[in-house]
Regions:
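Acidic-enriched and Gly/Ser
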Residues: 1-143, 147-174
């Protein structure tokens, strides 16, 4: 916790200049809105630790603005707003996600999809033969409705693996 907000550390660097005091250069990412912040901490500065717990939840369905998840151990269902879910565009029914809780307040901080997911292409323009010399890409729509850039050889009905953090195509799945 820094300045009353929750962050996680993305990167840090211990700096010991020739003159002056040692300090830490830290890149923090807000859990609430995903914004990054770079800050310089003196070695004497202290931050409040926040205990978090990761639990496996299965996505069931969408109801209005809420995404309904079920705890796989006790079958408790919880609603989450789409803003709290990383990679929400690639979420499909039955996917198992990690939901991160603040253990002191039992509130949901965010939910993460697996890093890679397999989705079926529901629509894409047919690729033209002979256009394989370059790394040409085209738009495709996957079963969740998200749009992804794919190579020309991908056709409607193919299953593809997508990196949920970046939204990029990684490979075709047979």
């Amino acid at each position: 916790r820094f300045n009353g907000k929750l962050y996680f550390c993305v990167d840090f660097q211990h700096v010991k200049p020739g003159k002056g005091n040692t300090f830490m250069r830290v890149t923090l990412k807000s859990i609430v809105d995903g914004r990054t912040l770079e800050h310089r901490f003196d070695i004497s500065e202290k931050l409040e630790d926040v205990r978090v717990e990761r639990r496996q939840y299965q996505y069931l369905y969408k109801e209005a603005e809420d995404f309904i998840f079920m705890n796989q151990e006790d079958y408790e269902q919880i609603p989450l707003l789409g803003d709290l879910i990383t990679g929400v565009d690639f979420l499909k029914e039955g996917d198992v996600c990690e939901v991160v809780f603040d253990t002191s307040t039992e509130t949901v901080l965010y939910a993460e999809l697996p890093v890679k997911t397999v989705l079926e292409v529901t629509y894409t323009e047919p690729g033209e033969k002979g256009n394989t010399a370059t790394n040409a890409m085209k738009d495709a729509t996957v079963e969740t409705g998200a749009s992804v850039r794919v190579p020309l050889f991908i056709n409607t009905g193919d299953k593809i693996r997508i990196d949920t953090r970046t939204g990029e195509y990684t490979e075709r799945v047979k």
